[in-house]
Design a protein with these regions (language model features):
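Alpha-helical transmembrane segments in inner-membrane proteins
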Residues: 1-360
């Protein structure tokens, strides 16, 4: 009977892994690759869904049009063709507005939840939509300005005022911010309504806008808004990696060398620009910014480097889908803002009841 091998002999006999050998699929590198691959797949799937939503938005409505005919209307329109005129004159502008406004609201909601660490935060619940709406209503009633390219400046100022008021009242605490947003909204919405009711011309021009309709605007309306959308998008992507540190807490983020105040300031400017532009385009649409970030984190995880781009894709998917549903359920159409609110309300209730509101 042979004596058992000594520990030294066993250590010499056992092969050591080569440092040059790549980690297997169950190792850390494999896990990173698997996670990254899944996230890329989710992003690609979202892009495909957005393209499908755009195609359906162009084809569906009170008067349905085949996809082949829709494509011809885009690339080789026939003069006098009713379907082509409807697609190019009505459905293309409302689809573009739905995509841009949805992306802006999705991004603004994701940033708002990140900097407040509040799962209930979105531009509507924080009062930014109400502030932007008040600015745009003042532009229409006091100065006769209804062109979105000009009124967006008033919307930006109104959203900025609401943002400052909410953070001044809420002192940065998640629950207090939600209450402050409700207070600011309760203050600004009646003022906007009163101003509109006192000015019949402004009311007639903004009545569909006030309920979140994507109609009544043409492609030229986007011309004055793209700087706000571009600034908001660039800032959102720039601060995305910093939001991961902020999610760990202000003290941890500061210990990692991050300027917490600068991150919140840049994200705040992005939120105000995006909320102001979205409101100028499509009116005060609520709860899109609430639903989209929750869906993005569920699909792709908590890494804001991926959450932020996904929010920019899921937002237009939701808003364009809401617009399509509104066209189909009623012959005289239901505004996208109303349908989006009907979709978002159950999510708001579920989040409020199923999770701690203390923070993300």
């Amino acid at each position: 009977m042979e004596p058992p091998a000594s520990p030294e002999a066993s250590a010499q006999a056992s092969p050591e892994p080569s440092p040059e050998a790549p980690a297997g699929p169950t190792g850390p590198a494999g896990a990173v690759r698997t996670g990254r691959g899944r996230r890329v797949a989710v992003i690609v799937a979202a892009v495909v869904l957005l393209l499908v939503a755009v195609a359906l938005s162009l084809a569906l409505g009170v008067r349905g049009v085949a996809l082949r005919e829709t494509w011809q209307a885009l690339v080789d329109p026939v003069a006098g063709n009713v379907d082509h005129d409807v697609i190019r004159g009505q459905r293309v502008p409302r689809t573009i507005i739905g995509v841009l406004a949805g992306a802006a609201l999705g991004l603004a909601g994701g940033l708002a939840q990140a900097i407040t660490r509040n799962p209930l935060a979105d531009p509507g619940l924080l009062g930014l939509n109400a502030g932007a709406s008040l600015g745009i209503v003042v532009a229409a009633t006091a100065f006769g300005v209804v062109n979105p390219g000009v009124s967006v400046w008033f919307g930006f100022l109104g959203a900025a005022l609401a943002f400052v008021l909410v953070f001044a009242i809420g002192h940065g605490r998640p629950v207090h911010l939600a209450l402050a947003g409700a207070t600011v909204t309760a203050l600004m919405v009646p003022i906007s309504t009163l101003l509109l009711f006192r000015d019949v011309d402004a009311f007639n021009q903004l009545r569909f806008w006030s309920v979140g309709a994507l109609t009544g605007r043409d492609v030229d309306a986007v011309a004055g808004l793209w700087p706000f959308l571009l600034v908001g998008l660039v800032l959102a992507l720039f601060v995305a990696h910093r939001l991961n540190g902020l999610a760990l807490g202000d003290d941890v983020a500061a210990a990692l060398g991050q300027s917490v105040g600068t991150t919140r300031l840049l994200a705040g400017v992005a939120i105000v620009a995006l909320a102001g532009a979205a409101t100028a385009l499509a009116g005060p649409i609520a709860l899109v910014g609430l639903v989209v970030p929750h869906a993005a984190r569920r699909l792709i995880g908590q890494d804001y480097r991926w959450v932020v781009p996904l929010c920019a894709l899921l937002g237009p998917i939701l808003l364009v889908a809401a617009d399509i549903i509104g066209r189909l359920v009623r012959q005289d159409e239901l505004e996208a803002g109303v349908v989006a609110a009907l979709i978002g309300a159950p999510v708001l209730v579920a989040v409020a009841r199923g999770r701690r509101v203390a923070g993300l």
